Amino acid sequence: MKERYEFCVNGLNIQAEFARSDTRSIFIPLLKQLTRLQAEKNRRIAVFLAAPPAAGKSTLCCYLEHLSRTIPGLTPVQAVGIDGFHYYQDVLDSHTVYRNGEIIPLAKIKGAPETYDVKKLRGLLESLNGENQFWPLYDRRIHNPVENAVEIREKIIILEGNWLLLDEAPWNSLSCDYSIFLRAGDESQLERIVQRKMMGGFSEEHARQIVRSNDWPNIIRCMNQSRRGDLNLAYNQNGILEEI
């Protein structure tokens, strides 16, 4: 049996369903493990949750945050996405990358690893244990980051994104206390991305063009070039999560 929830993700209201069996066998034990880890380290800890585009990272993080605040004995977690570390649109429009023998504007591959300010992300991660920080948030309604939009306040921070476990420089210079990789890669993801882009204001035709030329290659790159996490999960054919 599944339960339905609604979360605000990057400025959009998203509905999600989670199986009760997944909650009992995976999510609650994970949160208990993170609670113990934070207590042992006696400091703020960073957890990476990496997965391909449209695998459900953001909604899963929101759900884990919800569970941690409603189940007694768990240390509350705070979910934060890395999309706020995108370069601004004017930077993407004015800079290029060399790929497959072509010079391509970064704006055409927005969402690819090259379109993030990894140095900025690494700097904030390295100072995570100091005073409460304010991190950027990506707003899909304006297609740009919003600075100082999220206060980092909890002792367990779950950072989610496509490239957090990418085994390529400079991404492989990032460090965390615990990592999770969620494997997913099928055609249904493309439809979810199309709908998400249309909710952000793109026409269906434009959304499908972007998804085929940009998002699908990102899915393949994430699946093939990412390191395994401390916990590795995948949905089976019945939509139930399994450890792999």
Regions found by a protein language model. Give the residues of each.
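Small-molecule kinase domains that catalyze NTP-dependent phosphoryl transfer to phosphate-bearing small molecules
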Residues: 147, 169-172, 195-244
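Charged, amphipathic alpha-helical linker segments immediately N-terminal to NTP-binding catalytic cores
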Residues: 1-26
